[in-house]
Swiss-Prot record:
Residues noted as binding substrate in the record, renumbered to the chain: S16, R41
A Pfam family recorded for this sequence: CbiC
Catalytic activity: Co-precorrin-8X = cob(II)yrinate
Classification of source organism: Archaea, Methanobacteriati, Methanobacteriota, Methanomada group, Methanobacteria
Record carries keyword Isomerase: yes
Organism in which the protein naturally occurs: Methanothermobacter thermautotrophicus (strain ATCC 29096 / DSM 1053 / JCM 10044 / NBRC 100330 / Delta H) (Methanobacterium thermoautotrophicum)
Name this protein carries in UniProt: Cobalt-precorrin-8 methylmutase
Alphabetized GO MF terms: cobalt-precorrin-8 methylmutase activity; precorrin-8X methylmutase activity
Keyword vocabulary terms for this entry: Cobalamin biosynthesis, Isomerase
């Protein structure tokens, strides 16, 4: 549970999770068990109960994400910090020289360029966006055009410029997804959601 590896650590995590459940029980009453587990982990990781009210899942998101993980689908992130926090082999191309060149040539962000690069490399799997709205918009574009095989998208970029809009754009598609409405989100949320799915895919405690 939450990375606990000792008896004391497990007990702390258990008590914390009990507190989280009391705080958000009304807000998650309509969610399925897997969705509840994901939201609980997000709230636990951020110490912010508001995520229970602003986190949304599209129909079939959890099933598609778990199916991808169990069939050796990849995980792609927008920045290295998100990749570093995920407890599963993941890819982030933002530092690739080819991505830098593409971004400069096209006058787009490196985060967006990294999604184009991933698509050109035949990426298939779950896309995890915790910081860059431009990356999320590019994933939507590539997926709808049939150029990227995004099986499921965790779309939780943070910020006041483009974050809410990019999530609403994702919300309006049929791409399996989860989002946090409004400007809130970020690395801790993205990592918590991804690691919860990974645990669920292995039938482990979230």
């Amino acid at each position: 549970m939450m990375g606990a590896s000792t008896g004391q650590g497990y007990e702390i995590a258990r008590k914390s999770r009990e507190i989280v459940r009391e705080l958000i029980s009304e807000d998650i009453s309509s969610l399925g068990p897997a969705e509840v587990a994901i939201v609980e982990r997000i709230v636990h990781s951020t110490a912010d109960p508001e995520y229970a009210r602003i986190t949304e899942f599209s129909q079939g998101f959890v099933d598609e994400a778990l199916r991808s993980l169990r069939s050796s689908g990849g995980i792609l992130t927008d920045i290295e910090m998100v990749r570093a926090g995920i407890s599963h082999p993941s890819r982030c191309y933002i530092r690739e020289p080819a991505v830098r060149e593409l971004a400069e040539k096209r006058d787009i962000t490196r985060a967006a360029a990294s999604m184009e690069y991933a698509a050109s490399q035949g990426f298939r799997g779950i896309v995890v966006i915790g910081n860059a709205p431009t990356a999320l918009m590019k994933v939507i574009e590539l997926t709808l055009e049939g150029l990227m095989d995004a099986r499921a998208v965790i779309g939780v970029p943070v910020g006041f410029v483009g974050a809410a809009e990019s999530k609403e754009a994702l919300r309006g598609t049929e791409i399996p997804h989860m989002i946090t409405r409004g400007p809130k989100g970020g690395t801790p949320v993205a990592v918590a959601a991804a690691n919860a799915l990974i645990a669920l895919s292995k039938d482990k405690e979230v």
